[in-house]
Regions:
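C-terminal motif of bacterial Sec signal peptides marking the signal peptidase cleavage site
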Residues: 22-25
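Sequence/structural signature of beta-propeller domains
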Residues: 31-33
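N-terminal secretory signal peptides that target proteins for export/translocation
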Residues: 1-5
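N-terminal export leaders
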Residues: 6-10
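A residue-level marker of the well-folded mature domains of exported/periplasmic proteins
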Residues: 36, 40-219
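Sec-dependent signal peptide hydrophobic core
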Residues: 13-18
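Bacterial signal peptide processing site
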Residues: 27-29
């Protein structure tokens, strides 16, 4: 092969290589893989409505006794649960047909938990509970219940017993006196506890009781 032919073959091979490279360079570029779609973000759960709680009080909130203690409990609930609850109260609700009206109004206002804080609300509350299955009722010192109505009480008899022990030790006549409110089971129980406490240290003690038939009736 002559030198001229060799040079021509080298040129042809070089041109072929350049052409091949050019064809590769002009080919369609590979597209990058699309980025994955962001995961859907769940909408925040709606804030639950606060529990509405109502209290029916037999006396004024400033009576310094039974109603005052209940209202302190109501305030403690607000402090403990914050915006999860909304509380309200009606004071000086008589133990009569008016109690049913007040408690029924409370249920109608959307309260889901209602406290009747005196013995005389038992029958009115039972009537309202029967008509409001979606509401929970709590009755103080009573003994009747329903599917959505329960009772609660305090251990006042314990303090009454200790007061009796002190009175039994101090008496010189062996006759003790109790000025009592209304003869309901809770009050009778406290008088009995007082007497038993006194008799535990002085078996000769007797207790005389005077009923005023009022919960709150200052002069």
């Amino acid at each position: 092969m002559t030198d001229l032919k060799k040079r021509n073959l080298i040129k042809i091979a070089a041109l072929s290589a350049v052409a091949s490279a050019a064809l590769v360079g002009c080919g369609k570029k590979e597209e990058p893989a699309p980025a994955p779609a962001p995961a859907p973000v769940a909408a925040p759960a709606p804030k639950p409505e606060p529990l509405k709680i109502a209290f029916a009080y037999v006396g004024p909130v400033g009576d310094g006794g039974w109603t005052f203690a209940h209202d302190n409990g109501r305030k403690a609930v607000e402090q403990e649960f914050g915006d999860k609850v909304v509380t309200s109260f009606v004071e000086k609700v008589p133990e009569s047909a008016d109690a049913e009206r007040v408690i029924r109004d409370m249920a109608g206002q959307g309260n889901k938990l209602i406290f009747g804080t005196t013995f005389g609300y038992m029958e009115p509350m039972l009537k309202v509970a029967a008509d409001n299955a979606g509401v929970k009722f709590e009755h103080a010192t009573g003994y009747k219940t329903a599917e959505n109505m329960r009772t609660y009480d305090s251990r006042t008899y314990e303090g009454a017993y200790m007061a009796g022990v002190i009175a039994g030790k101090m008496t010189k006549s062996n006759t003790l006196g109790v000025v009592a409110s209304i003869p309901i089971p809770e009050v009778v129980r406290n008088i009995n506890s007082f007497t038993l406490g006194a008799q535990s240290v002085n078996p000769k003690v007797k207790t005389k009781v005077v009923w005023v038939n009022e919960w709150f009736n200052p002069p």
